[in-house]
């Protein structure tokens, strides 16, 4: 199991039966593959779906917000973008799982643009992180060049300020509580010294710090 799969598997443990969930593009879409037995969620997509189905149900005439072919489950609803964003902005999404370029110790998120690169816009990320009841960021702990992505202060353009509730990487789980960043779990095979060495942000260590089970 590679790093992204481990991250997706751990995030899936946070979702509750009956949740309405928005999964962002890329790594977050993998979360649906690791839902625990007995946990059923309803997937929402910004382009107007409630009740997305697994990849195996993909239809050539349907695409999700990332432009990928998708399917829908029995009872699904389809609507325009105005209704979709009313659901998001109205606080009706229980959890969103998004990727990240940078997260900092103040729960700020940068995940939509790398300076100097042309992008068509932020998409629905800003709405999701401000409107969802729980914001989970799923990303690899360091950049491809080994540099830190978990910083004292984000250096890339922000998506939202003080919006992240939980950050999951292949090395650790952090939670943002009462204005502080807390390390609550370390991955199986990792140790506190490694997490500190690869994390620029300052964080507190939970008294009941857990080590993730390898079989989760």
Curated annotation (Swiss-Prot):
It is found in: Cytoplasm. It catalyses: an acyl-CoA + acetate = a carboxylate + acetyl-CoA; acetoacetate + acetyl-CoA = acetoacetyl-CoA + acetate; butanoate + acetyl-CoA = butanoyl-CoA + acetate; acetoacetate + butanoyl-CoA = acetoacetyl-CoA + butanoate. Pathway: Lipid metabolism; short-chain fatty acid metabolism. The active site is at 46. The keyword Thylakoid does not apply. Inhibited by p-chloromercuribenzoate. InterPro entries: 3-oxoacid_CoA-transf_B, CoA_trans_fam_I, CoA_transf_AS, NagB/RpiA_transferase-like. Keywords: Cytoplasm, Fatty acid metabolism, Lipid metabolism, Transferase. The keyword Transferase applies. Induction: Transcriptionally regulated by the regulatory protein AtoC. Pfam families: CoA_trans. GO terms for molecular function: acetate CoA-transferase activity; butyrate-acetoacetate CoA-transferase activity. Heterotetramer composed of two alpha subunits (AtoD) and two beta subunits (AtoA). This is Acetate CoA-transferase subunit beta. The gene is atoA.
